[in-house]
Amino acid sequence: ENILKELKTINFTGIVADICSVKAPLLIAAQGLNYVGTHPMAGSNEAGFNSANKDLFIDAPWAISVVNETNKDALAAVINIVCELGGFIVPVDPHDHDESVVLSSHLAHVVASAYAKSVGESEFAQLAQLLAGGSFRDLTRVTTSPAERTAEIVWPNRKSLSRVVENLGENLAKLQNLL
């Protein structure tokens, strides 16, 4: 958001696009700029230059937040870049995007963290990890992401995430009652 403010102060007229995981606040901050909000649904639990993957975006869904004010030329240019990178476009309202990524991405980070913590606190943690197979690896993969990056991803959407975590807790309580 700070960068968008700076671009406004210098009357920047070029295209501004982002790849952030939350759209609605940026859309407000970018008013008056040739802004196209994007979010490639591709990533890795790894970080740093050595983790780069030239095929990361191939066949990846790429959310593009379009509103009436979106400059059509800027939109076309961004769509062209996404297609060149191998992604496929998913047009989406910014609010709908933010609510959907809570379910498809942000919740997974929180659940994986809670699951890993529960396993780690068990007296059987060491043996459980030794016996862990694909299910454990699949569920905990994102916990190896840098904590700072995970916080940056989920924090801007914390209100929606909190609501979804509450719903998950209710569902877990129902399952617990069935046991």
State where each predicted segment sits.
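Internal alpha-helical scaffold of NAD(P)-dependent oxidoreductase catalytic cores
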Residues: 54-142
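Short, flexible, solvent-exposed loop/turn segments with mixed acidic/basic and small polar residues
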Residues: 50-56, 151-152
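Interdomain hinge/lid region at the active-site interface
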Residues: 125-179
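Structural motif
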Residues: 1, 19, 65-68
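Rossmann-like NAD(P)(H) cofactor-binding subdomain of soluble oxidoreductases
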Residues: 3-50
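Residue-level detector of flexible, active-site-proximal loop/helix-junction positions
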Residues: 23, 42-45, 69, 96, ...
